[in-house]
């Protein structure tokens, strides 16, 4: 990092705001002691501020820019914990406790920092002991958050639009996107022409060696950033000074591409992504444009394999809802929908989906487990609710679990019939088979690795195969072999995968929990004999006749037993959603495939009534602000 001898009055005001947040009440005497002890520093994009495991000698205040915290994942890579924004501090935990650094901190883009040494900080604490109370409060708050599921929601302030395909007008998209971002804050668009007018052509193309011009423009950009919630930089489709300047200030880069163009990166894109000055540290999101009549994207994997990305978005040209979705995603206001497993009860998700669409609630990300994954994929494919319901009504006239194995060495059911039913349904809706990453809306599902006893979060791969893996109940269906692993039902580890949606970082989350209640207590201390079991089973079919026994039968045991661990974490999973939808399906069995109409209607009516109610259990205040 380089020392900065000159800083603007605006940057000084930003620092004072951060100091007040950190120290609490701030008087002139305390300010007079602090300011002379501070060191102003400039960090380039990609520069490491400190590394995990190093001794904690200093703490830092972010005056402008953005930092990223990450830890070693134990597999040779890194796991991102979050980002430190303007006005926030980093490093205080190690400075106070003397413990090694808990994470590696890297500058996402060009940043201005202020450093406060541990020695100077301790002198200040001795002189103003009341600071300790404020600091203790901040540390306790941070530690309390570390033990719970946290949303990785991030709101980029500087967004760069970089066209990588010829023929795309980035300025038009910036205007369209800016109009939609204005719903969430103040927006300023910086095109090459406007930048030349504001800063001068020489400053636009200045490099770090041209210190005066470079820093002057940096300060001007900092002030613009402070006056707006979003800066949209329109970069050139070439490796030039303006494009590099845009990338140096980027919190996120949108790579704009035409889906009908070759997916291989152009030379200028490769040069910008691999340069040594760290401009590639900002997250890059691929935005693929499709023709308006496109039924479903295809071959997305070729684009993703060629780039290191934080995500991708499919857009249909001149399709306003897709542009609305992009604006919600990049502004941190995306809406996520999570659907739990539940066997035949999963048809209720179709009714929930219909009610959400009728209420005008948009869905930007969707995920699920087992049967929830199947319905979630229909949402992700942008299949209208009525079309999805009609297709499943037709297909599931055939019982999906009736193809028993003559020699059940691996499973009771071969699974071929269910595979054929799903294939028929999806062929009617979208034509040929697709991959997970080809869905219009970003989709994930959960499977369990029988090979390595771990949860598998699936964001890519053949769609139907991945759905089969997510609902392959051990003992009922054979495992699905994929990438060297035997995959089985995701409900074993995570039947209600809200934690993955939180990791994605949506602004609002809707969760649909179809998990049944606990089995409950049994009567007596001995398991009943054969005659008592037979009598119990026969009485179940006679109206009004019960014998008082509570016995788990084979079908229920095979369904429920593998999900006991997942069920133990279901309550915690429900705590992170903004809107919890939990239809009453106790009268429906998990194998009642013939009750599709009834199940769909229960899901629809429950969701419709819940959305219309003023006060409803599970309907949190945050959900009232769903876009």
PLM regions: where:
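Flexible loop/N-cap segments at domain edges
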Residues: 212-216
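Hydrophobic residues at beta-strand termini and immediately following loops
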Residues: 41-43, 84, 116, 190, ...
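Walker A (P-loop) phosphate-binding motif
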Residues: 152-195, 335-341
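Cytosolic regulatory regions built on CNB/CRP/Popeye-like sensor folds
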Residues: 1-171, 183
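Patatin-like phospholipase
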Residues: 205, 219, 224-229, 238-367, ...
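P-loop NTPase switch/communication element
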Residues: 195-209
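Gly/Ala-rich beta-loop-alpha elbow adjacent to hydrolase catalytic centers
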Residues: 368, 372
């Amino acid at each position: 990092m380089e020392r900065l001898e000159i800083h603007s009055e605006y940057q000084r005001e930003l620092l004072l705001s951060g100091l007040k947040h950190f120290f609490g009440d701030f008087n002139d005497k305390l300010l007079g002691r602090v300011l002379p002890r501070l060191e102003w520093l400039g960090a380039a994009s990609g520069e490491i501020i400190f590394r995990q495991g190093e001794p904690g000698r200093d703490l830092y205040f972010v005056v402008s820019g953005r930092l990223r915290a990450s830890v070693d994942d134990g597999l040779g890579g890194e796991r991102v914990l979050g980002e430190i924004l303007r006005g926030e501090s980093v490093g205080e935990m190690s400075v106070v406790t003397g413990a090694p650094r808990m994470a590696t901190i890297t500058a996402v883009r060009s940043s201005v920092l202020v450093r406060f040494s541990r020695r100077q900080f301790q002198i200040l604490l001795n002189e103003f002991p009341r600071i300790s109370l404020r600091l203790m409060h901040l540390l306790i708050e941070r530690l309390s958050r570390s033990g719970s599921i946290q949303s990785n929601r991030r709101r980029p302030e500087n967004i760069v639009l970089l066209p990588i395909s010829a023929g795309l007008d980035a300025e038009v998209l910036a205007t369209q996107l800016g109009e939609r971002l204005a719903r969430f804050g103040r927006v300023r668009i910086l095109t090459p022409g406007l930048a030349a007018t504001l800063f001068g052509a020489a400053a636009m193309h200045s490099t770090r060696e041209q210190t005066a011009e470079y820093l002057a423009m940096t300060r001007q950009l900092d002030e613009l950033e402070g006056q707006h919630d979003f800066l949209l930089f329109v970069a050139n489709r070439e490796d030039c000074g303006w494009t590099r300047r845009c990338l140096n200030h980027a919190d996120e880069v949108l790579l704009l591409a035409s889906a009908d163009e070759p997916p291989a990166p152009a030379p200028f894109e490769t040069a910008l992504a691999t340069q040594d000055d760290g401009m590639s540290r900002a997250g890059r999101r691929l935005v693929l444009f499709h023709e308006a009549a496109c039924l479903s994207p295809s071959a997305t994997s070729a684009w993703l394999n060629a780039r290191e990305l934080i995500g991708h978005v499919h857009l249909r040209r001149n399709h306003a809802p897709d542009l609305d979705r992009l604006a919600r995603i990049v502004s941190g206001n995306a809406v996520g929908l999570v659907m739990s497993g539940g066997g035949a009860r999963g048809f209720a998700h179709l009714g929930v989906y219909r009610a959400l669409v009728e209420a005008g609630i948009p869905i930007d990300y969707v995920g699920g487990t087992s049967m929830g994954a199947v319905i979630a994929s229909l949402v992700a494919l942008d299949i209208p609710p009525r079309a999805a319901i009609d297709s499943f009504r037709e297909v599931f006239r055939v019982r999906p679990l009736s193809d028993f194995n003559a020699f059940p060495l691996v499973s009771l059911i071969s699974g071929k019939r269910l595979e054929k039913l799903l294939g028929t349904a999806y062929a009617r809706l979208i034509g040929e088979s697709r991959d997970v990453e080809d869905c219009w809306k970003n989709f994930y599902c959960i499977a369990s690795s029988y090979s390595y006893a771990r949860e598998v979060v699936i964001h890519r791969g053949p769609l139907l195969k991945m759905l089969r893996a997510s609902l392959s109940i051990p003992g009922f269906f054979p495992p699905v072999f994929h990438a060297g692993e035997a995959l089985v039902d995701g409900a074993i580890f995570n039947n209600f995968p809200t934690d993955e949606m939180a990791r994605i970082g949506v602004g609002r989350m809707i969760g649909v929990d179809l998990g049944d209640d606990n089995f409950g207590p049994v009567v007596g201390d001995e398991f009943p004999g054969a005659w008592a079991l037979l009598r119990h089973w026969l009485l179940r079919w006679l109206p009004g006749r019960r014998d008082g026994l509570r016995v788990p039968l084979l079908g229920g045991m095979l369904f429920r037993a593998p999900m006991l661990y997942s069920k133990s974490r279901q309550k915690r999973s429900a705590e992170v959603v903004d809107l919890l939808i939990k239809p009453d399906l106790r009268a429906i069995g998990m194998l009642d495939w013939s009750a599709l109409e009834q199940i769909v209607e229960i899901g629809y009516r429950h969701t419709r009534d819940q959305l219309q109610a003023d006060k409803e259990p599970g309907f949190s205040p945050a959900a009232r602000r769903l876009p």
